[in-house]
Design a protein with these regions (language model features):
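Extended Lys/Arg-rich polyanion-binding regions
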Residues: 1-211, 230-245, 255-257, 261
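Local cysteine-cluster metal-coordination motifs and their immediate loop/turn environment
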Residues: 214-225
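Alpha-helical transmembrane segments and their immediate juxtamembrane flanks
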Residues: 250-252
Length: 261
């Protein structure tokens, strides 16, 4: 055998699980086995005519106090967290996008102690901005995806260095969005997002609003590594979420050198 390439340990269960279709330098391979203890996956060359898409369950727990800014109906914070991620299986899709089937997997959970930038919004504030309870999950999810894509604007990272999770009912009982560093102990990316929240989330809002699609696309709110298959996503709701947060930031403590308007 020969070494083809490498993937991050934390992403291995989602990208090189048994049965996964793995692309490397234009060639297609299928994964035969994954040994997490030895950190090695065995593959064979094959083009099966379908793609695979891992399904994951992610949980997050705040493990320390961190730093918070209370903006009334919105709170912003940067906190230590413990992220637990479990790959439960994968979808097989034809090249035209048709779902063939779902294959269950039994893989151990992956644990990541790291740092996250987070914000919460009261349900009342969301309702006042046109987001009823049924739309909260998709609105937060879409805002989270877009924010992950724009964090490299203020932090020296790329999309693969960070992860996220949105919750209609977060650890504090409120709708919550987390964006976390994908490195054990954190790498400073989330902290930069917290310090420059107005710039970061403002650019995120602009990017979504400028995209001409109606319901969301890979250029705005869809994510190529979403463990939930980009469902649910509510693009108009994401715009309302970000406007709500930015309006609170505008009258609260400026976090990135900007004066309140």
């Amino acid at each position: 055998g020969r070494l083809l390439g490498g993937v991050g340990a934390g992403r291995a269960p989602a990208t090189v699980h048994p049965g996964a279709v793995y692309l490397h330098q234009g060639e297609t391979y299928v994964v035969d086995s994954l040994d997490l203890e030895s950190a090695i996956a065995f593959v064979h060359a094959e083009d099966p005519g379908y793609s695979t898409h891992a399904r994951e369950v992610t949980d997050i727990e705040i493990t320390g106090t961190g730093e918070h800014t209370d903006l009334g109906s919105v709170t912003l914070g940067v906190v230590p967290v413990a992220v637990t991620n479990t790959v439960t299986g994968y979808l097989r899709r034809t090249l035209s996008g048709e779902i063939l089937d779902f294959v269950e997997l039994t893989l151990p959970p992956q644990h990541l102690p790291t740092v996250a930038v987070m914000y919460t919004i009261t349900p009342e504030a969301l309702s006042a901005n046109g987001i009823d309870p049924l739309r909260i999950p998709g609105s937060l999810h879409a805002a989270e995806h877009a924010a992950i894509g724009l964090l490299p604007l203020v932090a020296s990272c790329d999309r693969g260095d960070i992860g996220g999770l949105s919750m209609a009912i977060g650890p504090g009982g409120l709708p919550t969005v987390f964006v976390y560093d994908g490195h054990p102990g954190g790498a400073g990316f989330a902290d930069r997002g917290y310090r420059q929240a107005t710039t970061w989330l403002g650019a995120t809002l602009e990017a979504i609003s400028a995209c001409e699609c109606r319901t969301g696309c890979p250029s705005c709110v869809q994510s190529p590594k979403c463990g939930n298959g980009n469902d649910p996503l509510d693009k108009p709701g994401a715009i309302a979420v970000l406007r709500t947060v930015l309006a609170a930031l505008e009258v609260g403590r400026p976090l990135d050198g900007r004066s309140p308007a």
